[in-house]
A protein has these predicted regions:
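Alpha/beta-hydrolase
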Residues: 112-114, 218, 313
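C-terminal motif of bacterial Sec signal peptides marking the signal peptidase cleavage site
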Residues: 12-14
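Serine-hydrolase catalytic machinery in alpha/beta-hydrolase-like enzymes
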Residues: 80, 84-190, 194, 199-203, ...
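Acidic catalytic loop of the alpha/beta-hydrolase fold
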Residues: 245-248, 318-320
Length: 352
């Protein structure tokens, strides 16, 4: 695994221990140290995985992984490299991880994983532990870099937002470059992301449902007005969020810690309600997974099979469940693997 290009190296413990499950929606901060505090989020991101063999359980989804998509003339093979692209007059890059099982003649699944605010693609690579999953399951991962370590996700965050960077067009340009170099199955392209990258995942669900089979935001909410989110088709959504997230509060509002942005976030329940209504889900919510502090609820019988699943973490902080824990921002669960759950969900929801 390549080293993360971060300026501050911190000791990172493994994800925290589990606690009793709270079946309700309501969540409030439980750590008094969050109240009135402040944090430089750049200080919280990982430079190395302290426990690369860690694993956690995940719910099962019916996989649909077979593909008949084939290619000729693709020149790049397995390993890691930087995919460089010009978009909107800006030089952009994504770090690629391609498993050794990759066959340049057969369509591979592609996951685009967006980092959090003040983070980097390298940090997302380490925090999510997605490379290990990629090697085991044979899919390709792209870890894009945001301008000034941020993404324009509609109403958030940083210089990309205030400067009007077009990260949707960047995503389209990046996918074009990746597909020119690798054999990618166009029906198995997916988006996930953490925090600001989770916000962007929601936005891509609104604006690129014709490209992505499904989205899986972690610790992010819908960052644009619901009235402006008009997917071309119902898109499956898998969402992760901690009930005690101090950065993007579960019930919305301003962060419980000072992250240097005067933003009022939409709540997780409101975000989920939007997707459930947008996808026309008819079945009442059903619990499909419960282990320790992790509970996953599914809304099904949705238009086009676009199920909505929400995994909430009791007392969970601003974390990637089952991943490398970030200090300062609350508890990280070991009772579910966000990465394994996301990949299983993606495999079950190819583009129609």
């Amino acid at each position: 695994m390549r080293a993360a290009a971060l300026t501050i190296a911190l000791f990172l413990a493994g994800c925290g221990t589990s606690s009793a499950v709270d079946a309700g929606w309501e969540g409030t901060p439980t750590d008094a140290s969050f109240e009135g505090g402040s944090v430089n989020l750049a200080d919280a991101y990982p430079t190395a995985d302290p426990n690369p063999d860690a694993s956690a359980p995940s719910p099962d989804f019916d996989a649909s992984t077979s593909t008949t998509f084939t290619c000729t003339g693709k020149t790049l093979g397995s390993g890691s490299h930087d995919e460089n692209v010009s978009s909107g007059g800006l030089a952009r890059v994504a770090h690629m991880h391609v498993p050794s099982s990759y066959d340049a003649t057969k369509g591979a699944m592609l996951v685009v994983a967006y980092h959090g605010f003040s983070e980097s693609g390298y940090a997302q690579e380490i925090q999510s532990r997605m490379d290990k999953s990629s090697d085991a399951k044979g899919y390709i991962v792209a870890y894009p870099e945001g301008i000034a370590t941020s993404w324009n996700a509609g109403d958030c965050c940083g210089d990309s937002w205030t400067g009007g960077v077009d990260d949707v067009q960047f995503t389209r340009d990046l996918l074009g470059a990746i597909e020119a170099d690798y054999c990618i199955d166009p029906k198995r392209v997916f988006a996930t992301g953490f925090s600001n990258g989770g916000f962007l995942s929601h936005r891509l669900g609104c604006e690129m449902s014709d490209v992505f089979g499904a989205i899986a935001p972690v610790a992010g909410v819908l960052g644009e007005a619901p009235s402006s989110c008009k997917p071309k088709r119902p898109i499956p959504v898998l969402d992760f969020h901690g009930l005690s997230d101090p950065v993007v509060p579960y019930n919305g509002g301003t962060p419980f810690i000072n992250i240097g942005m005067g933003i009022v976030f939409r709540s997780v329940p409101d975000t989920l309600s939007f997707w459930v209504n947008e996808n026309g889900c008819l079945a009442p919510p059903v619990t499909i997974f419960q282990n320790g502090d992790a509970t996953c609820t599914e809304w099904s019988l949705c238009k086009g099979g676009a199920d909505v699943v929400h995994c909430k973490i009791d007392q969970g902080g601003h974390q990637w469940p089952g991943g490398v824990a970030l200090p300062i921002v609350g508890k990280c669960s070991t009772d579910i693997s966000a990465t394994d759950t996301i990949i299983d969900f993606f495999e079950a929801h190819p583009l129609p």
